[in-house]
From Swiss-Prot:
This is 5'-AMP-activated protein kinase catalytic subunit alpha-2. Its EC number is 2.7.11.1, 2.7.11.31. It comes from Homo sapiens (Human). The modification Phosphothreonine is found at T172, T258. Residues 16-268 form the Protein kinase domain. Residues 477-521 are annotated as: Disordered. Disulfide bonds: none annotated. The gene is PRKAA2. GO terms for cellular component: axon; ciliary basal body; cytoplasm; cytoplasmic stress granule; cytosol; dendrite; Golgi apparatus; neuronal cell body. Changing S523G: In a breast cancer sample; somatic mutation.
């Protein structure tokens, strides 16, 4: 059990020094934290033991947190660690700098349809991931959807949701009334997933319209509107998305759209990245994955026989079984995402003979994809010779490193044209060193600091090119050969912030607050220049946004 300590007048929990308050929730505050050694920023949710003890949910929260630490989805805020003190639980979570979707809509108004669809696809993918692992959110709203620096959605606050099982009904009313389903505000029994679908429908409406489908400052009138299920559909919404909204906002939960229905809807399927809903036909649920079993044993400090007994018990809520399936699912998601983020290393049997290849000016073979030349031979050796321990060490090939980048078989000029298009779309600035080498920077909207990286297109064999990403620290001096050509791509919303939670027995007497206006090649850490602060994480975010944009 960790103890709270003082660090230069600030509270320190474990290795994290707590800073400013990011928000206040039902059970306590959320503060920004900084790792004392690495400087990486995290969000720290503080759960007051006394408050959760009064609700008799201490044991349940502990069990949920144990499983949520294993959740790994690109659009769910990660829970890294839980630190306990005599008075509080400290949930150390992923920090994103873009703020709440709610604030974004309040500031910018309704979102363009294509962008709304992209965000909604990400949100639904995250909700589906949690539902498949028996977790319901029950309080989905734009305030719980966070945005990273590149406008990708990340759902937060799964930590206090109920684990669900077949036949179990959630009797508690929680959440914000504007986003709550009719069965929730009416105090009726509900199973769980369908209330998240309703809330997703409200979020989609807010994205497309900049307002809420059900809204009234008088709570009893608001409840009447929600129970009636009648809402205004603006003329500018196309018929396809309007039918989807009406299906998701069905008052009868039995008639309401399921995630399967939404995924099959024509509007939702447009430009849908496959990594959001991975399918692996080779996966057989009847085959036990030994590596996953070992990983569960390491994380839970248990024996393999205990894990096997949990898997054969058939209890979907057993914590070891849940952990095992999480690990399997995460692996499947990463494999599917490889179409967008993973560029595999070149075939190890390829020969790098410059005389056999035409290399455009400014483009060079990748230095770590070229075997060393033998002094008495004009030809290069096969990289597989490095595995032959019987050969002299002087002839051994140095093991190739992994690099952050994208591999492609397109023409080099076409690759660079796509890079320029993506950089302009992302509002990056760049300097041209030569036709295949750029120095790029992006300004962090929160800190105001610039994140810099080098993009270099390499030839890896006679058919493939590697666009290599390399972090540039502030101390790196720009090469004089580059020509400085910085490039940049070039209302009041009807949303208000409802109460963060409500009790179904007293909700009718509450009034709402006022309106507000308004193909990763892997990464060797040697190719990244880690330093104190969030530079490395900013660099990876920058890489991810560029890779994602190029993949579209």
């Amino acid at each position: 059990m960790a103890e709270k300590q003082k660090h230069d007048g600030r509270v320190k929990i474990g290795h994290y020094v707590l800073g400013d308050t990011l928000g206040v929730g039902t059970f306590g505050k959320v503060k920004i934290g900084e790792h004392q050694l690495t400087g990486h920023k995290v969000a720290v949710k503080i759960l007051n033991r006394q408050k959760i003890r009064s609700l008799d949910v201490v044991g349940k929260i502990k069990r949920e947190i144990q499983n949520l630490k294993l959740f790994r989805h690109p659009h769910i805020i990660k829970l890294y660690q839980v630190i306990s003190t005599p008075t509080d639980f400290f949930m150390v979570m992923e920090y994103v700098s873009g703020g709440e979707l709610f604030d974004y809509i309040c500031k910018h108004g309704r979102v363009e349809e294509m962008e709304a669809r992209r965000l909604f696809q990400q949100i639904l993918s995250a909700v589906d991931y949690c539902h498949r692992h028996m977790v319901v959110h029950r309080d989905l709203k734009p305030e719980n959807v966070l945005l990273d620096a590149h406008m990708n959605a990340k759902i937060a606050d799964f930590g206090l949701s109920n684990m669900m099982s077949d036949g179990e009904f959630l009797r508690t009313s929680c959440g914000s009334p504007n986003y709550a389903a009719p069965e929730v505000i009416s105090g009726r029994l509900y199973a769980g997933p369908e209330v998240d679908i309703w809330s997703c429908g409200v979020i989609l409406y807010a994205l497309l319209c900049g307002t809420l489908p059900f809204d009234d400052e008088h709570v009893p009138t608001l409840f009447k509107k929600i129970r009636g299920g009648v809402f205004y559909i603006p003329e500018y919404l196309n018929r396809s998305v309007a039918t989807l909204l009406m299906h998701m906002l069905q008052v009868d939960p039995l008639k309401r759209a399921t995630i399967k229905d939404i995924r099959e809807h024509e509007w939702f399927k447009q430009d849908l990245p496959s990594y959001l809903f991975p399918e692996d036909p080779s996966y057989d649920a009847n085959v036990i994955d030994d590596e996953a079993v070992k990983e569960v044993c390491e994380k839970f400090e248990c024996t393999e026989s205990e894990v096997m007994n949990s898997l054969y018990s058939g209890d979907p809520q057993d914590q070891l079984a849940v952990a095992y399936h999480l690990i399997i699912d995460n692996r499947r998601i990463m494999n599917q995402a490889s179409e967008f983020y993973l560029a595999s290393s070149p075939p190890s049997g390829s020969f790098m003979d410059d005389s056999a290849m035409h290399i455009p000016p400014g483009l060079k073979p990748h230095p770590e994809r070229m075997p060393p030349l033998i002094a008495d031979s004009p030809k290069a050796r096969c990289p597989l010779d490095a595995l032959n321990t019987t050969k002299p060490k002087s002839l051994a090939v140095k093991k190739a490193k992994w690099h952050l980048g994208i591999r492609s078989q397109s023409k080099p000029y076409d690759i660079m044209a796509e890079v320029y298009r993506a950089m302009k779309q992302l509002d990056f600035e760049w300097k041209v060193v030569n036709a295949y080498h750029l120095r790029v920077r992006r300004k962090n909207p929160v800190t105001g600091n610039y994140v810099k990286m080098s993009l270099q297109l390499y030839l890896v064999d006679n058919r493939s090119y590697l666009l290599d990403f390399k972090s540039i620290d502030d101390e790196v001096v720009e090469q004089r050969s580059g020509s400085s050509t910085p490039q940049r791509s070039c209302s009041a919303a009807g949303l208000h912030r409802p109460r963060s939670s409500f009790d179904s027995t007293t909700a009718e007497s509450h009034s709402l607050s006022g309106s507000l206006t308004g193909s990763l090649t892997g990464s060797t850490l040697s190719s990244v220049s880690p330093r104190l602060g969030s530079h490395t994480m900013d660099f990876f975010e920058m890489c991810a946004s560029l890779i994602t944009t190029l993949a579209r």
